[in-house]
């Protein structure tokens, strides 16, 4: 997972300078807890090669589940793998009984906002990012409200 995250954000060396520790912690956590890895994330593979990774935090259920890391290796970007990966994660997350929302936080200068919006996420908050990661843009907060979806399907 670490190598996928590092490669996915290689377009700007400041990403690794700011987030390398977090990427390593995520990799270590999932390696040390394989029983969690299979329930709350997955790797996207093409021809047996891991090209992407996504994970989510279910601890705030039933109020919401928050998507964490969501990355595709640089060589595979622009081929629909990111949207397919996110769509599959949403399918799995929607299986939680009584879940009200799916949330994600990203940054305005990344390409991620377009991907989230393309699968139904709606922006509900935007905050200035004055810290060391300011180069990545404002913090954007997105959600999909599932209670409305469920009411529409009833």
Go through each PLM region and give its residues:
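Conserved beta-strand-loop-alpha-helix junction that forms the acyl-donor binding cleft
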Residues: 103-113, 129-135
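Conserved GNAT acetyl-CoA-binding A-motif
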Residues: 93-106
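Conserved beta-strand in the GNAT
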Residues: 43, 49-58, 64-66, 71
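Conserved GNAT-fold acetyl-CoA-binding loop/helix
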Residues: 3-31, 39
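Conserved acetyl-CoA-binding loop-helix of GNAT-fold acetyltransferases
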Residues: 72, 78-91, 117-118
């Amino acid at each position: 997972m670490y190598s996928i995250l590092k490669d996915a954000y290689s377009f700007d060396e400041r990403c690794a300078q700011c987030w390398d520790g977090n990427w390593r912690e995520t990799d270590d956590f999932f390696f040390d807890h394989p029983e969690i890895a299979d329930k709350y994330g997955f790797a996207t593979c093409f021809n047996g090669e891991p090209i992407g990774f996504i994970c989510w935090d279910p601890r705030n259920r039933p109020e919401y589940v928050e998507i964490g890391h969501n990355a595709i290796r640089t060589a595979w970007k622009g081929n629909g793998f990111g949207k397919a990966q996110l769509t599959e994660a949403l399918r799995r997350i929607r299986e939680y009984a009584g879940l009200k929302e799916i949330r994600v936080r990203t940054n305005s200068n990344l390409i991620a906002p377009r991907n989230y919006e393309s699968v139904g996420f709606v922006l509900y908050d935007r905050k200035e990012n004055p810290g060391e990661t300011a180069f990545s843009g404002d913090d954007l907060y997105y959600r999909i409200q599932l209670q409305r979806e469920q009411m529409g399907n009833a």
